[in-house]
């Protein structure tokens, strides 16, 4: 089964023509570009033979610098040197200001509330900054490959939401790149390892970078490559290891940094010690007038709580995937922080097997993306590889009573399209509001709103007679579109979801955990809401019936009795006793059964008035 054997419009070519395509790892700290050459995925180095391009842009008064040259300006001109822009992309200004208040930049809001960074070259959006980095990578690729690129595959974190993914695509288009696909970083890494070496079975991708941690559980079988579950922690990475060493040095020397420069110096020394401890049993840190020696055992003790935290996240991901650790056949290590021996040792013990480390963990994501780019651009028409990513949080719709009906459950493989039919609640209803939600809870107030739109032009009908088909579609890049259509008239409305800011993987994990912690309460709240909705429906129906036929078909005592039972249900509906509401509904149903029978007989008599048997048999 081949994956998306496509040709872009205008790109049809002879079968033997080789198109130039690359995979790009657009990282928070560093970025890389790779391509398949002579059947092998390789990193494309810059003019100085450097593989890593710092994800930094400096906007000077007279010139713009990208990469290492820009990074060297960070301490000299911090306000005009943009670092870690990946953390800002797809977020609102208030979100950026609350999360990253320590950043040296001056921000203003764009017309749509997104952050603009004030630089010597004017306001720059995170999309523009990312575009400049991508332009640099594009230049490196075209110089190395000797021609114009036909397409690129860009990797993104597994938890990037619609806004962050769309912003990444916008940045690529601004850089003049044809985006073949966005690919989850763990998926790319597993592709570089698993598919390239013929692996089959369950694969775990343990991705520990400088600032974040991601875990993905994947299944590879007969060419189908499926992400079963993902998890992560935005506050866990190699930078945290550096800070732990720095704090240890302060504790040993009793000296605290007095300036920002001293703090940067100490963190740099801590980072160097961490790197030394990768291959040596101890490292010496000389700071101020002191020299202290830290052993690998001491370092392991410092980072133990963080490594344990990552393994707890792994355990949750395995549970989501309904997989036991013993079933995992291979563990792929991604990210520079996985070079730490203690990390490899603990991950190996957790999964019961030695992790795969033969590919440079800094490069594995870009190498996997290059393999996928080579397939999508049409150079490997005989490929049987199929990649399936997943929806990290359930997608649903608001129904009566403030309830959430899940349309696409979390961890559903994408691309995916799911449809469900809904109906009107009131007689003569000609419009329906569609509220799109994200999350695992049962009530609207506990989930995240993604957007709203209104379907108008529904033919006036009795309540429940109209059929509205609502379709949720998530494409291969994780972007969501929702369409609502009234089936008899084909009138429809739709929305493409592009939230103004994104969710971090920490927030996604918190939302999932919240759904587990509140499962019982949520179920009770849902049952109560459903009873209230049913009560509203019954009350509405009885009121309409009384207004239409009550005076004609009921005696005064009967009318008052139904009104009394109706009032009792209206009162009990305001409470929180779902059993009492159910009893009230049953009581009203009993009280109105004779009335309903009389209405039915009256309707039949009216329909038959003036007709003989032959009219009925031969209408």
Swiss-Prot record:
Function: Chaperone involved in the maturation of iron-sulfur cluster-containing proteins. Has a low intrinsic ATPase activity which is markedly stimulated by HscB.
GO biological process, alphabetically ordered: iron-sulfur cluster assembly
NCBIfam families for this protein: HscA, PRK05183.1
Name this protein carries in UniProt: Chaperone protein HscA homolog
GO molecular function, one term: ATP hydrolysis activity
Keyword set includes Chaperone: yes
Family per similarity comment: Belongs to the heat shock protein 70 family.
Keywords: ATP-binding, Chaperone, Nucleotide-binding
């Amino acid at each position: 089964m081949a994956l998306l054997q496509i040709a872009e419009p205008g790109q049809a070519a002879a079968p033997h023509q080789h198109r130039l395509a690359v995979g790009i790892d657009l990282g928070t700290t560093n970025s890389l570009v790779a391509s398949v050459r002579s059947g092998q995925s390789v990193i494309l180095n810059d003019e100085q033979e450097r593989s890593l391009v710092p994800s930094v842009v400096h906007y000077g008064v007279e010139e713009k610098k990208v990469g290492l040259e820009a990074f060297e300006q960070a301490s000299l001109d911090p306000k005009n040197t943009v670092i870690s822009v990946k953390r800002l992309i797809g977020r609102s200004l208030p979100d950026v200001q609350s999360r990253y208040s320590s950043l040296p930049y001056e921000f203003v809001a764009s017309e749509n509330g997104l952050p603009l960074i004030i630089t010597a070259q004017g306001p720059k959006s995170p999309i523009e900054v990312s575009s400049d980095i991508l332009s640099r990578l594009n230049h490196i690729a075209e110089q190395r490959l000797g021609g114009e690129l036909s397409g690129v595959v860009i990797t993104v974190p597994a938890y990037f939401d619609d806004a962050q993914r769309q912003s990444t695509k916008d940045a690529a288009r601004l850089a003049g790149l044809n985006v073949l696909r966005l690919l989850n970083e763990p998926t790319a890494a597993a592709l570089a390892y698993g598919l390239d070496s013929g692996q089959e079975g369950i694969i775990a991708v343990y991705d520990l970078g400088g600032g974040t941690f991601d875990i993905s559980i994947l299944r590879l079988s007969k060419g189908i490559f499926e992400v079963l579950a993902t998890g992560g922690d935005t506050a866990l990475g190699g930078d945290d290891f550096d800070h732990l060493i720095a704090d240890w040095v302060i504790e040993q020397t009793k000296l605290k940094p007095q300036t920002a420069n001293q703090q940067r110096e100490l963190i740099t020394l801590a980072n160097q010690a961490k790197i030394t401890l990768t291959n040596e049993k101890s490292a010496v840190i000389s700071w101020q007038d002191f020299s202290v020696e830290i052993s690998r055992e001491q370092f392991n003790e410092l980072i133990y709580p963080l490594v344990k935290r990552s393994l707890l996240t792994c355990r949750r991901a395995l549970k989501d995937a309904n997989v036991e650790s013993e079933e995992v056949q291979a563990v792929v290590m991604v990210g520079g922080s996985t070079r730490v021996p203690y990390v490899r040792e603990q991950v190996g013990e957790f999964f019961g097997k030695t992790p795969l480390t033969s590919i440079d963990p800094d490069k594995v994501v870009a190498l996997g993306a290059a393999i996928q780019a080579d397939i999508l651009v049409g150079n490997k028409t005989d490929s049987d590889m199929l990649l399936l990513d997943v929806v990290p949080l359930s997608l649903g719709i608001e129904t009566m009573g403030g309830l959430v009906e899940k349309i696409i459950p979390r961890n559903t493989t994408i691309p995916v399209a799911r449809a469900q039919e809904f109906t009107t609640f009131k007689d003569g209803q000609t419009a329906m509001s569609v509220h799109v939600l994200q999350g695992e809870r049962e009530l609207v107030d506990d989930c995240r709103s993604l957007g709203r739109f209104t379907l108008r032009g529904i033919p006036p009908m009795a309540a429940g007679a109209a059929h509205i088909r609502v379709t949720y579609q998530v494409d291969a890049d994780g972007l969501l579109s929702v369409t609502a259509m009234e089936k008899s008239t084909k009138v429809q409305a739709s929305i493409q979801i592009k939230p103004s800011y994104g969710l971090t993987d920490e927030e996604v994990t918190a939302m999932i955990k919240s759904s587990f912690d509140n499962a019982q309460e949520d179920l009770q709240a849902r049952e109560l809401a459903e009873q209230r909705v049913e009560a509203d429906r019954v009350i509405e129906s009885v009121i309409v019936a009384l207004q239409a036929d009550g005076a004609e078909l009921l005696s005064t005592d009967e009318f008052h009795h139904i009104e009394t039972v109706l009032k009792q249900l209206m009162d009990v509906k305001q409470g929180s006793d779902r059993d009492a509401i159910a009893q009230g509904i049953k009581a009203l149903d009993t009280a109105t059964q004779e009335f309903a029978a009389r209405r039915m007989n009256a309707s039949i008599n009216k329909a038959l008035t003036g007709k003989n048997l032959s009219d009925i048999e031969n209408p």
